[in-house]
Amino acid sequence: MAATDDRAARAARLTGLYAVTPDVDDTAALVAKCAAAIDGGARAIQYRHKTASDALREAQARAIVALCRERGALSIVNDDAALAERVGADGVHVGEEDGSVASARAIVGPARIVGASCYDALPRAVDAVAEGAGAEGGGPEQGLLGHRSASVSDTWLCLPAANRGQGRA
């Protein structure tokens, strides 16, 4: 299977519940939370810990990647393409201040998912796809006080590029 075919297959699996980890320093507790999320229906776990040391982030990312492989879920590393590559994650998610989608793609290669935060902005999503992103995050799906409801275009933006045009919006 070619690398781009592998990426398309991974992106096609990026449907359903997508869980993002909390900042938890206890690796065993974090892995237990991730296992519970997968047991509850999460199809992907995005490892995100903004305050951990590099060593802790690598250890936790490795543990989550192993869990996701064992349970058939996708593993995504937040903000750090080099870490995603080192631990063998299925992909990386980059925000506005985490470097470009193109540089993340260069680090993780063509077979992994590269997602990008688009902050509910269609031009940002279009740019991310042009740079090689396979998944764009449009905003939170949970109801937040004072947060507007997601529009149809926002929902479309949150779909992996491989799923667009397949009647899933």
Residue ranges of each PLM-predicted region?
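Conserved N-terminal beta1-alpha1 strand-loop-helix module at the mouth
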Residues: 1-101, 106-121, 125-134
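Active-site/ligand-binding-proximal alpha/beta "capping" segment
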Residues: 132-169
